From Swiss-Prot:
E.C. number(s) listed in UniProt: 7.1.1.-
Biological processes, Gene Ontology terms: ATP synthesis coupled electron transport
Native organism: Photorhabdus laumondii subsp. laumondii (strain DSM 15139 / CIP 105565 / TT01)
UniProt keyword terms in alphabetical order: Cell inner membrane, Cell membrane, Membrane, NAD, Quinone, Translocase, Transmembrane, Transmembrane helix, Transport, Ubiquinone
The name this protein goes by in its record: NADH-quinone oxidoreductase subunit K
Function according to Swiss-Prot or TrEMBL: NDH-1 shuttles electrons from NADH, via FMN and iron-sulfur (Fe-S) centers, to quinones in the respiratory chain. The immediate electron acceptor for the enzyme in this species is believed to be ubiquinone. Couples the redox reaction to proton translocation (for every two electrons transferred, four hydrogen ions are translocated across the cytoplasmic membrane), and thus conserves the redox energy in a proton gradient.
């Protein structure tokens, strides 16, 4: 069994990597990928803590997080596809120009 601290440190590192990708990147696709990494890091933390306590609640939260991430990814990718068709670019700066 993996110690609680190791699992939580791994989840924290993944969360920080996703947050860094979300903040630094200007491409919306990479921002969406960073958000997915953050969601998976939080889900990993739920699984690790649930395993440590011997409760299935962490796995239930993981299933919920994965289903929400799938819905978020499908809607986000559909919006990105429409944006790319209109602007031929996925840069975040072009989205702010769409206001009018």
């Amino acid at each position: 069994m993996i110690p609680l601290q190791h699992g939580l440190i791994l989840a924290a590192i993944l969360f920080v990597l996703g947050l860094t990708g979300l903040i630094i990147r200007r491409n919306l696709l990479f921002m969406l990928i960073g958000l997915e990494v953050m969601i998976n890091a939080a889900a990993l933390a739920f699984v690790v803590v649930g395993s440590y306590w011997g409760q299935p609640d962490g796995q239930v939260m993981f299933i919920l997080a994965i289903s929400l991430a799938a819905a978020e990814a499908s809607i986000g990718l559909a919006l990105l596809l429409q944006l790319y068709r209109r602007r031929q670019n996925l840069n975040i700066d072009t989205v702010s120009e769409m206001r009018g």
